[in-house]
From Swiss-Prot:
Pro residues compositional bias, start-end: 14-25
Protein name: Protein TITANIA
Species, as recorded: Oryza sativa subsp. japonica
Sequence ranges of Low complexity compositional bias: 104-117
ZnF segments: PHD-type: 406-470
Segments of this protein annotated with the region Disordered: 1-136
A Pfam entry, by short name: PHD_Oberon
Lineage of origin: Eukaryota, Viridiplantae, Streptophyta, Embryophyta, Tracheophyta
InterPro entries xref list: OBE1-like_PHD, OBERON, Oberon-like_PHD, Oberon_cc
Length: 727
């Protein structure tokens, strides 16, 4: 190499300097030249020690340290520069401005030239006998080995006089004592930098170095060496005191840490670094790595994914990982089938942004996880339908990959676990669902023309984005309340009533306005805790059943009635308060039967009696009774109005039926006449054919008759002639 030594550290102080060394006053000692051109013990024995000086006596302290059970190699790569001639002691020209420059990554090799001269002393034992490989305890601590320190100083090195400092590293006449591996000649140890942590990793992180130098947390350097072959010796100078603490290695293994030469210290393997590797590296390679991880480290990875998804500060990092996954084209069904279980859960959780996959709850089969990652199965663990649902080919299912029409909102493309609620609204035709809040924001719930009433009337409808079909909202809300309202608590009931109020806020029809007013009324009373949730539920159900409940008059009168009833029940706690049920309405609207229910016109067998309820009431309750009577009169007027509307609707339906019947009869007669005409034409054609056949046969008969008559006439004439001749 380019470096040389003046013998200030290697030679004996009493020995004269070598005559073969040219005087290079400014030469520097590089680590690669120091380690590659140092004579070996084996070659010294073969070469007879030519060109080498006497060695230093062995160091007893170092020998004692070599017998230690830790088998540590003490070296210091920070003090290997030979002092320049002419420089005062302690002068370090590499320190500029109080800062030490950072060195480039250098790949070091301790392979020695087999034909180089060496003359080690016979008293120095071979270093190969002192190096004992230590088995790896973790995937990150790969082959970290410790060796005993070398007690004796090495012999002085000889140099070729033909080697100049201006010689290029790639020149043809370069000495073959250099390592066959990659070296960075610009990395001189005379810089004395404390940042040469990647010295043993090679240029650009090469993995081909013979020795892996992995720094410890205290700045020292440890060697990881493969087992030495027979006949191969290795040399380490005594000027490299360093030690690898066994306690640090044990702490690294117990804490899940790793030696990272590129970062310069022992540190715990960060879960986010492993997550980035899982996202970017090969599936098979990471599956093998995760296979050796203990369950505690796998749980740490799951916890890191959950924290990344739930934390608002790490949304950018999550989005970055998702973009990396989207750019990968090698993630197929076959590739993901070879993935580790935890690896697959992490990939699905990162891609979908759902932390449920890494919580350990609701374990999903690996095949379904692969389908969820490839967006061929719904990612909702409560649904897990095969996509597209029912082979739907609407504009949403065909364009939005991974969209599930059975549980995902068609507007925001999100899902939740809500069920039996008015917060979701569905289409009657295609079955797509949507959040009510999203539909209201996009104005998908709006008044539309109705088919039930007269022409020009409207009702509140939901416009589906998938099929553009309009579904009426009153019947949907009515069905939800009839099926699910009894199981709701007070909080849920108030939330549902608030959504009902928002849905029918801009309604113009009679039913929608009444439901909006009823929802506001009951919601206000529930907020003031004037009525119980059970009474509120019964009031809403009575509204859906009869159109108007006991106290369903909008405005201040209705609120006053409910408040009066509440105060009355408070004053009469000792008395049993029977439930006052209004008589059944005269008209029962049913979709499966006729519009008018004639049985409802019959008088009720048990007339409503409210006298026992008010017989023991005080005079203060008379006003409440009068208010109730007025309320009943108002209800009677409303019922009469409903009856009139029903009669008008019946008349319109009858007129429609008549016109449709007449039109159908005309169409039927026309089709029947057309069919009969075709049949008649066919019969006429057949008759004409028969007539023609008869005419032809008759003509043949006449010709035969005429021919026979002619023949008979001729015979008669001949007979008369013959008779005359005989006479």
């Amino acid at each position: 190499m380019f470096g040389d030594s003046d013998g200030s550290k290697d030679a004996n102080p009493g020995a004269p300097p070598s005559t073969t060394d040219p005087p290079f006053p400014n030469r520097e000692l590089t680590l690669s030249s120091y380690l590659c051109e140092k004579p070996t013990l084996a070659s010294a024995a073969a070469g007879g020690g030519g060109g080498a000086g006497p060695s230093s006596p062995p160091n007893p302290a170092a020998a004692a340290a070599g017998d230690d059970g830790k088998h540590c190699v003490e070296r210091d790569f920070l003090h290997l520069s030979a002092p320049k001639r002419g420089d005062p002691p302690g002068d370090d020209s590499s320190v500029v401005g109080g800062k030490k420059p950072r060195l480039d990554s250098l790949q070091l090799s301790l392979s020695l030239n087999s034909d180089g001269p060496a003359a080690p002393p016979s008293s120095q034992p071979p270093l190969a006998s002192l190096l004992q490989p230590v088995p790896a305890t973790d995937g990150d601590l790969r082959g970290a080995a410790a060796a005993a320190a070398v007690p004796a100083a090495p012999a002085r090195r000889t140099y070729s006089a033909t080697t100049a400092r201006t010689r290029s590293i790639n020149s043809d006449d370069m000495s073959y004592s250099y390592s066959i591996f990659s070296h960075n000649p610009s990395c001189s140890l005379t810089h004395n930098s404390t940042d040469i942590y990647a010295a043993g990793e090679g240029t650009n992180g090469s993995v081909h170095s013979r020795f892996n130098f992995r720094p410890m947390g205290d700045g020292s350097v440890a060697f990881a060496t493969p087992p030495l072959k027979e006949g191969t010796s290795s040399f380490f100078p005594t000027e490299l005191p360093a030690r690898m603490a066994a306690a640090a290695a044990a702490a690294a293994a117990s804490a899940g840490g790793s030696f990272d030469g590129g970062r310069g210290g022992l540190h715990a393997s960060r879960p986010d670094k492993i997550l980035r590797d899982i996202v970017s590296d090969s599936v098979t390679a990471m599956a093998q790595v995760l296979q050796d991880f203990p369950s505690e480290r796998l749980e740490l990875l799951r916890e890191a994914v959950r924290g990344m998804i739930d934390s608002h500060e790490k949304r950018d990092e999550l989005a970055s990982l998702q973009r990396k996954l989207e750019r990968r084209s090698d993630l197929t069904t076959e590739t993901l089938g070879r993935a580790n279980r935890t690896q697959l859960e992490i990939l699905v959780a990162i891609k979908t942004g759902i932390a449920t996959f890494v919580t350990g709850k609701g374990r999903v089969p690996s095949s379904e996880l692969v389908e969820m990652f490839l967006m061929t199965r719904c990612r909702n663990l409560n649904c897990k339908s095969t996509l597209p649902v029912d082979d739907c080919d609407c504009k949403i299912c065909s364009t939005k990959k991974g969209f599930c029409s059975a549980c995902t909102c068609s507007v925001c493309h999100k899902f939740d676990c809500a069920a039996n609620t008015c917060t979701w609204v569905g289409c009657d035709v295609c079955g797509h669902w949507c959040h009510v809040a999203c539909a209201l924001e996009r104005n998908l719930i709006r008044p539309g023309p109705t088919l039930k009433g007269p022409i020009g009337t409207t009702e509140m409808q939901f416009q589906c984005l998938a099929c553009n079909h309009s579904s009426e909202m009153f019947g949907f809300v009515k069905e939800v309340f009839n099926c699910c309202a009894e199981n709701w608590n007070a909080e849920t009931l108030m939330k549902e009533l608030d959504f009902v109020r928002k849905i029918f806020a801009g309604c113009e029809d009679f039913e929608g306005k009444g439901l909006h007013a009823k929802a506001e009324e009951v919601l206000s009373l529930l907020g003031k805790k004037i009525i119980s949730p059970l009474d509120a539920t019964n009031s809403i159900l009575q509204f859906f059943k009869y159109g108007v409940t006991d106290y369903s008059v909008t405005g201040s009168t209705s609120k006053g009635i409910l408040a009066a009833q509440a105060s009355q029940s408070t004053d009469m706690r000792s008395l049993q308060t029977p439930t006052i049920t209004p008589p059944k309405s005269s008209f029962n609207f049913k979709t499966t039967t006729s519009i008018l229910d004639t049985d409802a016109l019959k008088p009720s067998p048990k007339p409503l009696s409210i006298e026992p309820h008010f017989s023991t009431a005080s005079k203060e309750d008379d006003s409440s009774l009068e208010t109730i009577v007025k309320c009943k009169e108002a209800e009677a007027k409303l019922f009469q109005k409903l009856a009139d509307d029903a009669r008008k609707e019946v008349d319109s339906y009858r007129q429609i039926v008549r016109s449709r019947t007449q039109k159908l009869e005309e169409e039927y007669a026309a089709k029947l006449a057309k069919v009969c005409f075709q049949e008649t034409e066919e019969k006429r054609r057949k008759k004409l054919e028969e007539l023609k056949m008869l005419e032809n046969s008759h003509y043949d008969y006449l010709k035969m008759k005429m021919r026979m008559q002619t023949d008979i006439q001729g015979l008669l004439e001949r007979m008369e002639a013959t008779k005359k001749m005989w006479v």
